[in-house]
């Protein structure tokens, strides 16, 4: 074995030299130089510095402006809450443990951090799935005159929490477990061992299929159909400037959504799956740490992509920051012009971009 497995941890280094120690009790500077842990702490501080105000403003502005309290924005609000949740309950702990070079809060703290980080990430992921389904139903109209209302939005929010809990709770009760990963200063699901005592193999397969592959397939299908529908609408009315503009906006949004989803999560999922399917192979702590920490940046990308590119929301945020006045123009007029976000149907001459 090229790693050292303990009762509640797995350190990616052989203990032939006798230097491996529990990541809950001793600094892990034999895995990486101290400055690398400082870099991780600085990176987490940056995510906290950016993530807290962005996601807080998203929540605050939506609460302050009634025009933003639309069914679709309930999902966006849930997404921002999940990101804020990740920053407060996950990133702050990871920054502190990185400064110390090991997981100073013990096994209980590891389960706490692993649970809340997983829960927040899964809420965000399934919120993106619900958004994709909503956009598909509204734009592609597979169910004729279906109208996405408040009840549907609340059901969507409840669905994201149910799916997130279905992923984050089992390790707390003996189906898999949370352990320190990579450089041993943050916790996640155990991809490193088969651990038959906790049926780890079956949980990892369940997690990859249900909580990664299926969401990816749904998102890809929905936005793929959305692009095709918009192009068809544009082709039927070449003279319509509104349709042409909507096509460009939708295409841009879809490209950004899919690319950043893949950038954030595929490297982490690939490395985790590689480690799990190559038990006993040699890999360094950096191999898992870099993609794991990079995936955390989704808490910053999500509000920027899904909300900051929303013109109506951006106008409301500017108005809030400028004490009730929009120095860049008439907020009401601008909001009316961009109220396509609230659209729940697609006519032959207009396609709702977001």
Curated annotation (Swiss-Prot):
Family: Belongs to the G-protein coupled receptor 1 family. Opsin subfamily.
Glycosylation (residues): 2, 15
Main localization category: membrane
Pfam families (UniProt xref): 7tm_1, Rhodopsin_N
Lipidated sites in chain (S-palmitoyl cysteine): 322-323
Location of the motif 'Ionic lock' involved in activated form stabilization: 134-136
Record topological domains on the Cytoplasmic side: 62-73, 134-152, 225-252, 309-354
Any one GO biological process: absorption of visible light
GO cellular component: membrane; photoreceptor disc membrane; plasma membrane
Chain positions covered by the region annotation Disordered: 331-354
Membrane topology category: Multi-pass membrane protein
PROSITE patterns per the UniProt record, alphabetical: G_PROTEIN_RECEP_F1_1, G_PROTEIN_RECEP_F1_2, OPSIN
Name under which the protein is recorded: Rhodopsin
Lineage: Eukaryota, Metazoa, Chordata, Craniata, Vertebrata
Organism of provenance: Aquarana catesbeiana (American bullfrog)
Segments passing through the bilayer: 37-61, 74-96, 111-133, 153-173, 203-224, 253-274, 287-308
Cystine pairings recorded for this chain: 110-187
UniProt PTM: Contains one covalently linked retinal chromophore. Upon light absorption, the covalently bound 11-cis-retinal is converted to all-trans-retinal. After hydrolysis of the Schiff base and release of the covalently bound all-trans-retinal, active rhodopsin is regenerated by binding of a fresh molecule of 11-cis-retinal.
Known role: Photoreceptor required for image-forming vision at low light intensity. Required for photoreceptor cell viability after birth. May use a mixture of retinal and 3-dehydroretinal as visual pigment. Light-induced isomerization of 11-cis to all-trans retinal triggers a conformational change that activates signaling via G-proteins. Subsequent receptor phosphorylation mediates displacement of the bound G-protein alpha subunit by arrestin and terminates signaling.
